[in-house]
Structures are given as C-alpha cells and as structure tokens.
Regions:
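Extracytoplasmic ligand/sensor domains, especially the bilobed periplasmic-binding protein
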Residues: 114-231, 285-312
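Extracellular/periplasmic periplasmic-binding protein-like sensory domains
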Residues: 166-172, 178, 276-349, 427-432, ...
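C-terminal region of N-terminal signal peptides and the immediate post-cleavage residues
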Residues: 15-32
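Extracytoplasmic "Venus flytrap"
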Residues: 34-46, 50-72, 205-214, 340-347
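Beta-alpha junction/loop-to-helix N-cap segments that form part of ligand/metal-binding clefts
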Residues: 31, 35, 62-69, 81-163, ...
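N-terminal export and membrane-targeting signals
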Residues: 1-11
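Immediate post-signal peptide segment of exported/extracytoplasmic ligand-binding proteins
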Residues: 27-50, 85-88, 192-200
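Segments of small-molecule ligand-sensing domains
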Residues: 335-345, 356-423
Length: 446
C-alpha cells in the first residue's frame, strides 16, 4: 500500500471569489442579529477549523503533512490579511493515522469542537455518518461542513455536505447503476495527439487497494477513449513493487514499440518505470505521461537524467510562476517558500480559500454573527466558478465546487534539464479550460 497512496492524488487531478465581488478576507461588519458564538467552533474572536489527515503512521510517516502545512499556511495568510468574519482562524490538526477508526474518532471530535473540516485527507474515511449526523449548537442535525483535499471512498465523494475542490470522477447519481458514469480529464491527451499522430501504449495502475484500482481505472479508460490505443491490458502492480517488477512492463513497451506510457501511481512508480525501461533499451516512447504526483522535487532529485522529458499535467498554476499569479505567490510566502510546498499543500491552500469565500458570502448576507454551519452549507452549494483567487488572480480555472463537477482546466509541464518547464498553454500564468478537456465514460466497478 505504501507507494500506491500517491495514486489517489494522481486520479483526483487528471487541483476567487465566486459570488461576492471581493477576493480577500471580508471586512468586519456590524449587522444586527445573531450571536458572536453563532455555532460550534465560533467565538467572538476565533473560528476553529479541523484538518484531519493521515500523518503519523508506520506505513509512510509524514504522509499528508503537506495537507496540514497548506491549511496552516491559509490560516496564517488570513490572520495577517484582515481576518475572516472579524475573527482569527484557528487550525486544529487531528491525525487519522491511516485508520478508519481514527478517522471516525477525528470527525466526532471535530463535530464537538470545530466549525468545519478543511483539507480533509484521510484515506480510510469510509464512514460519513458522524459527519452527516453531526448536530449544531442548537441541536439540529445540520452536519459538519467539509472542504476536503482528497476523497477516496464513494460515500465521502457523494456526501452533500462535502465540497471537494477536486471533484470525484464518479457521477454520484449513477452510483447504483450498472454501469456507473465517470468523468475523465483528457486535455493533455488531446495535446499529445496533436503532436504525435499515432499514440499507443501501456498504463500501470496500483493494485494494493480496491479504491486505488477503482479510482485509476476511469483515468486510463478516459485516455483510451480520447484516442491512445492499448497495447496491453492495464498493468496492476503493487505500490511496494521494486524496479525489477517493472521488467514485464518495459518488455511489453519494447515488444510493441509503444509510443505512450503512464503510471497512475505515486512518483516512485514512474521512476521505476523510467529506469527499468532505460535498462531494457526502450527508445520508442514519445510521451512519458504523468500528473501531479510527478510534480515533486523528489522526483527530479531521485530521477536525474532518467526522467528527462517526463510530462506532468497540473490543474493549478505552477509554483515556478509565482510572479505571474498572486494566489501562488501568497501560498508560497505563507508556507515558507517553494522548498516547503508540494501538491498536497497546494490543494489544501485552495480548500482554505474556498472556505474563506463561503464564509465571506455568509457574512455579506447575514453579518459577522450570522455564521452557522447550516448557512455555510447553503452558501457553499451556490459557488459554481471558484478559482482560488488572491488579489483577483485565480490559482485554478473556474470550478463548479457547489455542484461537485470535475474541472478540465490544466497546464502541461515537462522535465527539461532537471526543471519543470511549461509546455502548454504557452503563456505563463494561464490554464487551458477547453470544454473538450473532460469526457464521460461508463464502467461497472461494483
């Protein structure tokens, strides 16, 4: 399981003020009505939010520390830029320890102490009952608002009080259908096809968990629908596999003179694939594909020259372009520099900004003392073009978070000389958001 964990992030990717006109913290308001202690986790001077994440665990210590760092960076930014609803944001980190029981206990604790969950990143969050049946300050079963970084289980993905910036691939209305309907990002595939007429190849999926297989299969299937032909059935390889376990994959690439190859697992899987392919003398591949998991300093340092040419498609403006984007710049400043930033932290930052926008919308309508969980959930459902903006510049393309719709916006980078270089679209600080970047597929994964 250890190395397959990044696969869940690879799937989720292919990572603004949405309703009110401002893009920062809301100014203090003194509208009548309500109480300074308007709901659980809200006092006259503080809004408490919980970040539940798998960090301390024996499998991969520090796994989602980036998520915690990202939420804390958000709070640091907000508290230094006008606060939120006239209050400071306090982050309560609750470790879920890669455990379903710990995740459940963490949600129960957050229900009792915090206004909402932000940046949730617990792989075994498979019981949403404590979240959905959480009672508010007046005893109503409102539910505990959730703005997660990652959702791996269908009940969490389809919860009506959970608002993921990266929407789940599954169409929740089809969960009980046979087959189910999924959305897949294919913008990068459309770009590759314009550059290479005949793409055919292989995909590696992580085999350790049913959830990783179910999450990655729609991604690979979407690629084939977009026009990359399969040379072999999808390879399913354990996240604990070593480089030698990729010998059959490299042999298949060589046998078919494959022009396309992608591992939809963690960055180490892509490293093993590239290194073993080099040993086997593979020379036919035109597109070594990858997503957010390969946008990592460790991928560059451990891969060296062996990963030159690797593509990494992102759904946010790259860190290298902080000068072109105020949200990226604010994120990197708050977290302590590019060296401390990673994909998990960036996603958590955008989750925090969504929380900010929803709170600001509540405050605009009801005043600082009108902030309740029920109103938060109501306003969250109305946001359909979230961009994670700071100073009017969004880190994301317009995203329909309120309706749980997948965003097809992307930027394609490529490793060149040990650095990530923007490939498409050419202009820095931009994303490609063509409607053709998302396709639908049908799979029965029950």
């Amino acid at each position: 399981m250890k190395r397959s964990l990044w696969a869940l992030v690879a799937v989720a990717v292919g990572i603004g003020w949405a309703v009110s006109p401002a893009a920062g913290a809301a100014p203090a308001q003194n509208q009548p009505g309500g109480s300074p202690n308007s709901d659980i986790g809200v006092t006259a001077d503080t809004i408490r939010i919980a970040v539940i994440a798998d960090v301390d665990n024996p499998v991969q210590p520090g796994l989602f520390q980036g998520t915690v760092n990202g939420v804390q960076a958000f709070a640091k930014y907000i508290n230094g830029h006008g606060k939120l609803a006239g209050r400071n944001v306090q982050v309560d980190f609750i470790d879920s320890h890669l455990s379903a029981d710990e995740a459940r206990n963490a949600v129960i604790r957050a229900c009792q102490e915090d206004f909402a969950m932000v940046g949730t990143n617990a792989l075994f969050f498979n019981n949403v009952q404590p979240m959905e049946q959480c009672v508010d300050q007046v005893g109503q079963m409102t539910g505990l608002p959730d703005v997660p970084t990652l959702q791996t289980e269908t009940p969490h993905q389809c919860s009506q009080i959970s608002f993921a910036i990266i929407a789940a691939a599954i169409d929740c209305a089809t969960v009980n259908d046979h087959p189910q309907t999924y959305s897949a990002r294919v913008g990068q595939i459309l770009y590759y096809k314009k550059q290479n007429k005949d793409l055919h190849g292989i995909w590696v999926l992580p085999s350790d968990l049913k959830s990783t297989i179910n999450s990655t299969t729609p991604v690979a299937t979407g690629d084939t629908k977009a026009g990359v032909k399969q040379d072999q059935d999808f390879f399913k390889i354990s996240g604990l596999a070593t480089q030698s376990d990729y010998t059959p994959v490299a042999a298949t690439i060589k046998q078919h003179n494959s022009t396309y190859a992608q591992s939809i697992s963690d960055y180490k899987s892509s490293l093993n694939l590239r290194k073993e392919s080099k040993i086997q003398g593979v020379s036919s591949v035109k597109v070594w594909d990858c997503a957010l998991q390969c946008y990592d300093a460790k991928f560059l340092s451990q891969g060296g020259a062996d990963v030159d040419g690797q593509y990494a498609s992102l759904f946010f403006i790259p860190f290298e372009e902080a000068k072109q984007n105020k949200s990226v710049d604010a994120f990197l400043t708050a977290i302590g520099g590019k060296g401390k930033a990673d994909g998990f932290a960036a996603q958590a930052w955008t989750a925090g900004l969504f929380f900010r926008d929803v709170v600001n919308n509540v405050v605009k309508a009801d005043g600082n003392n009108g902030l309740t969980r029920a109103r938060f959930i109501e306003e969250a459902r109305k946001i359909h073009d979230f961009t994670a903006a700071v100073g009017g510049q969004g880190m994301l393309g317009p995203t329909d978070v309120g309706a749980h719709k997948l965003n097809g916006c992307f930027v394609l980078t490529q490793v060149k000389g040990g650095k990530y270089v923007r490939v498409f679209p050419k202009e820095k600080g931009t994303l490609n958001c063509d409607s053709k970047n998302v396709t639908t597929i049908k799979l029965d994964q029950t």
